[in-house]
């Protein structure tokens, strides 16, 4: 096997637990409710915080990868992912589990752009790169699909923390393999990080989701829910305007005028909702 395909296998190995963790808790709600005494709202945050934080952190982590090199980003993200998995497995309360899942998402947000950058730099030929990207997408979809199955099997035979604890040995093996196999990419120190904009985006997403959950459950006064929603919308508007005016934005908003990209985004949103 050529070094290119060995590199791809190493990259895909670290991506598998990232994909599985997006859905592994979908069957764990009753178990978590009993084990941690968590409320319905806390259960929703335990499940959703991973995707929400990851969505806001992927873009700045891609910029961080440009600054430090994507191999370093991959190894750092894997280490954070493993530590967060251990913290999640040992969480004594719902709030500590939510915090651990948020940290888990930070590690995942480092891994995702690092794997894509690794594929792009490893495969110079377009046909091979397209095949590698197809395998990457298949691993992501397959991991998310198998997440509930993996979670169900582990919960049936072990305690609830095993759905996170299983990540630790996988991450240790993956770090060792990637440190040896994945080639080092050159860093671009001039790439802006825009951490403030990333934090604003995360805050906007969390505020909008929190207001939607609160409105459905009626836990807050209507005026307070509306205020949180308006705050989130204002932050999101500020973020979009910053991207439109920046010389080197984190997101090129003009991409959303492309029909293929826009239709893909809409399909992804529809799939996530249903």
For the regions a protein language model found, what residue spans apply to each?
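Small-residue-mediated transmembrane helix hinge/kink sites in multi-pass secondary transporters
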Residues: 30, 62-63, 116, 151-152, ...
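Short hydrophobic/small-residue motifs within alpha-helical transmembrane segments
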Residues: 51-52, 141-142, 268
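12-transmembrane solute porter fold
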Residues: 4-20, 25-27, 40, 222-231, ...
């Amino acid at each position: 096997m050529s070094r290119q395909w060995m590199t791809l296998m190493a990259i895909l190995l670290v991506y598998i637990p990232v994909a599985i963790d997006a859905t592994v808790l979908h069957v764990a709600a009753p178990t978590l409710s009993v084990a941690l005494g968590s409320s319905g709202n806390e259960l929703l945050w335990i499940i959703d915080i991973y995707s929400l934080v990851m969505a806001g952190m992927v873009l700045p982590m891609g910029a961080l990868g440009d600054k430090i090199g994507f191999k370093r980003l991959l190894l750092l993200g894997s280490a954070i992912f493993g530590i967060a998995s251990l913290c999640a497995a040992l969480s004594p309360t719902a709030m500590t589990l939510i915090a651990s899942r948020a940290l888990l998402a930070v590690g995942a947000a480092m891994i995702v752009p690092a794997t894509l950058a690794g594929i792009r730099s490893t495969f110079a030929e377009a046909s091979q790169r397209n095949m590698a990207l197809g395998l990457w997408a298949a691993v992501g979809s397959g991991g998310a699909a198998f997440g509930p199955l993996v979670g169900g099997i582990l919960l049936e035979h072990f305690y609830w923390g095993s759905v996170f604890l299983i990540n630790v040995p996988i991450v240790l093996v993956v770090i060792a393999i990637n440190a040896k196999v994945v080639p080092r990419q050159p860093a671009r120190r001039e790439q802006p990080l825009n951490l403030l904009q990333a934090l604003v985006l995360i805050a906007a997403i969390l505020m909008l989701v929190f207001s939607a959950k609160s409105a459905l459950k009626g836990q807050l006064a209507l005026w307070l829910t509306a205020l949180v929603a308006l705050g989130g919308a204002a932050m999101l508007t500020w973020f979009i305007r910053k991207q439109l005016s920046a010389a080197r934005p984190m997101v090129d908003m003009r991409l959303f005028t492309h029909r293929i990209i826009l239709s893909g985004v809409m399909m992804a949103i529809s799939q996530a909702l249903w």
